[in-house]
Design a protein with these regions (language model features):
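Metabolite-binding pocket within alpha/beta catalytic cores that recognizes anionic/polar moieties
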Residues: 1-142
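Glycine-rich beta-alpha junction loops
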Residues: 32, 100, 161-166, 191, ...
Length: 254
């Protein structure tokens, strides 16, 4: 049975969205609560659908039609979100997430814009073999960098690691990644990049750093105001990047 083929152009099983419900441009936070924060930046924001961990809002930012859909935590649910959004017309995706840095030069409140992700997860291996790279769309990466620079936000461009097991990352494991020059960790981006590539979509990620696992700064400090600031900056940069891409501002256009 071709589940994907059967759901093209239909109301989607998990996200409960159908044709016409979503825009070409989509922001993908993990947290449903972050969808509400994104909606605060949108004109005419309205709730489109909610089912399980998937909350979807739609509105406009600087004239650009934008959808925000939460993916939940991890690659399996992120893959479902991307597939189902693409089935009903979404084409450009920017993940707006949080991240734990392992590069000691990356501070809480900074942004990380990945140019690649190590596939330390299981979902992408159902799509492509070992050794296949997980890389974002260059035009979107450039638009994110330009947006961060325009706002004067401190950002880092580099490789991240997408991991499955939040509590199983040992000090030795993190040190090995740090020696490779890995900037930070997340739990969704590598699968986002792989699925987008296979489906002919555009995808990138911007991450707000909420802790540094090497220095210990911010680890589990849930009330740290820098966490909220990091998320706000990531949202702003992602929205501005979409506006730049829509205008064709040197990033390929939509």
């Amino acid at each position: 049975m071709d589940k994907r083929g059967m759901s093209l152009g239909a109301r989607q099983y998990h996200l409960a969205v159908g044709p016409g419900d979503v825009s070409e441009c989509v922001l993908l936070p993990g947290d449903p609560g972050r969808v509400l924060k994104i909606a605060e930046f949108l004109e005419g924001a309205r709730k489109v659908a909610e089912n399980r961990e998937f909350l979807t809002y739609r509105g406009t930012y600087r004239g650009v039609d934008v959808t925000a859909t939460s993916t939940g935590i991890g690659c399996p649910s992120a893959a479902i979100a991307i597939e189902e959004l693409a089935n009903v017309g979404a084409r450009v995706f920017i993940r707006v997430g949080t991240s734990g840095a392992i590069d000691p030069e990356v501070s809480v409140g900074d942004l990380v814009i990945p140019v690649g992700a190590i596939r330390n997860e299981g979902t992408s291996y159902y799509y492509v073999p070992e050794g296949f790279p997980a890389v974002p769309d260059f035009g979107l990466v450039r638009a994110l960098v330009e947006a961060a620079e325009e706002r004067g936000y401190r950002y880092h461009v580099g490789v991240i690691s997408t991991d499955d097991a939040f509590y199983a990352e040992t000090p030795d494991y993190l040190e090995d990644l740090r020696k490779l020059g890995v900037k930070s960790l997340d739990m969704e981006s590598s699968t986002l990049f792989v699925v987008a590539h296979l489906r002919g979509l555009r995808a990138a990620t911007v991450l707000g750093v909420v802790a540094n696992l090497t220095t210990g700064d911010g680890v589990f400090a849930v009330e740290d105001p820098r966490r909220a600031e990091a998320v706000r900056r990531a949202i702003e940069v992602a929205l501005e990047a979409l506006a730049r891409v829509k205008e064709g501002g040197g990033a390929g256009g939509i």
